[in-house]
Amino acid sequence: MKKLSLYIFLVLMWCNVGSAKEIKEIEVEGMSIGGSLLEYFTEEEIKEATAPEVYPDKFEVTYNIRETLRFDFITVTYKSNDKKYKIHGISTGLKFSNNIQDCYKEQNKLVEEISMNWKNWGTLPFDDEDNSTYKPITFEDGKGDAISISCYYFPEDTSINNLKISLSSREFKNYLKEYLN
């Protein structure tokens, strides 16, 4: 069943990638970078789904604001104190139990698909170590917007192993670089 879900996910998620010229044209669950969460949810629903202090002082993150058949999870990031709730990040993905190799296979399929459709986007380097629990492959356009496809693997807690696809505005991506360093 998990494989079927993944293939449905791949087809539905990436069918609009091939025709998109910019990241804001890619839709995930109908939402896209630059759109407003208020187009889909009430302010109360947004606040209820927002996790406190994930990215202090700058951005807020909603968790599973919408039930979805395609993904195991979905998060949407917007700027703190933005009354329009402009979307700066969307992440979604599928959980993998304890076989990281399966995650890597699916990651490679997605990378190949993006590489064929987004020829003008370059990949960013990542220092890959054999024992790493996080393996991202990131595509960036000339404007700084990014698509990341990442495998997360934690042998001690298989409930959080996942293949994650993230769309990020330049502003959010730059913030993450500063925040994580």
Predicted feature residues:
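Sec-dependent N-terminal signal peptides
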Residues: L4-N16
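Generic marker of residues within folded, mature protein domains
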Residues: Y7-L10, S80, E129, F139-D141
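Hydrophobic alpha-helical context, especially transmembrane and signal-peptide helices
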Residues: V11, K21, E25-I26, S80, ...
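Short linear interaction motif-like sites in intrinsically disordered regions of transcription factors
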Residues: C15, D72, K119-G122
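Non-cytosolic coordination micro-motifs
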Residues: K21-E60, N64, G89-N181
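Compositionally biased P/S/T/G-rich terminal and signal peptide-adjacent segments
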Residues: E60-K86
